[in-house]
From Swiss-Prot:
GO biological process: modulation of chemical synaptic transmission; regulation of neurotransmitter secretion; regulation of synaptic vesicle fusion to presynaptic active zone membrane; synaptic vesicle exocytosis; visual perception
Protein name per its UniProtKB record: Complexin-4
Spans traversing the lipid bilayer: none
Region (Disordered): 14-51
Residues that make up the propeptide removed upon maturation: 158-160
Assembly behavior: Weakly binds to the SNARE core complex containing SNAP25, VAMP2 and STX1A.
Compositionally skewed regions (Basic and acidic residues) per UniProt: 41-51
Major location category of this protein: other
UniProt topology in membrane: Lipid-anchor
Residues modified to Cysteine methyl ester: C157
C-alpha cells in the first residue's frame, strides 16, 4: 500500500516538473542489479542462480519419475484386470525415458500375488480347494443340480 501511495505521489511530482523523479531513478538503478540487492558479488549471485536451476531440474526430474512410476502401476493394474489402456499413462512413461519400473515394494507385492494366482490355477491348487471343501456340500449340490435337470427334462418331454 505504501508503494502504491509513493508511486502515485512521485508520478504527480514528475508531472509538475519539479524534478523529484531524479532521486527515484537513482534508487531504481541500485535495485536493477540483483546481486547487489541480495548482498552478494556478481560471481556469487551467478553461482547461486546456477545452483537454484540445478536444484529445480533435479526436483522436476524426481517429480517426473514419480509420475511415471504411478503411471506404470496403473498400466500394470489395467493389464491385470483387463481394463482399457490410457494414452496419458503411456505418454508419462515415455516422457520419463521408458526407464520406469514399479517401486520395489510394489514389485514384491505383485510377485506374491502372481505366485498365489499361479498356485490357485494349478492342478495342485484345485486339489487343495477340493480338500478344503466339505464332501457333503459337494454331494448335495450335485444331487440338487441332477434333480433340477431331471425335472426340466420331464417338463419338456412327456415320454420320460
Amino acid at each position: 500500500m505504501a508503494f502504491l501511495m509513493k508511486s502515485m505521489i512521485s508520478n504527480q511530482v514528475k508531472n509538475l516538473g519539479f524534478g523529484g523523479g531524479s532521486e527515484e531513478n537513482k534508487e531504481e538503478g541500485g535495485a536493477s542489479d540483483p546481486a547487489a540487492a541480495q548482498g552478494m558479488t556478481r560471481e556469487e549471485y551467478e553461482e547461486y542462480q546456477k545452483q537454484m536451476i540445478e536444484e529445480k531440474m533435479e526436483r522436476d526430474a524426481a517429480f517426473t519419475q514419480k509420475k511415471a512410476e504411478r503411471a506404470c502401476l496403473r498400466v500394470h493394474l489395467r493389464e491385470k484386470y483387463r481394463l482399457p489402456k490410457s494414452e496419458m499413462d503411456e505418454n508419462q512413461i515415455q516422457m520419463a525415458g521408458d526407464d520406469v519400473d514399479l517401486p520395489e515394494d510394489l514389485r514384491k507385492m505383485v510377485d506374491e500375488d502372481q505366485e498365489e494366482e499361479e498356485d490357485k490355477d494349478s492342478i495342485l491348487g484345485q486339489i487343495q480347494n477340493l480338500q478344503n471343501m466339505d464332501l457333503d456340500t459337494i454331494k448335495e449340490k450335485a444331487q440338487a443340480t441332477f434333480t433340477e435337470i431331471k425335472q426340466t427334462a420331464e417338463q419338456k418331454c412327456s415320454v420320460m
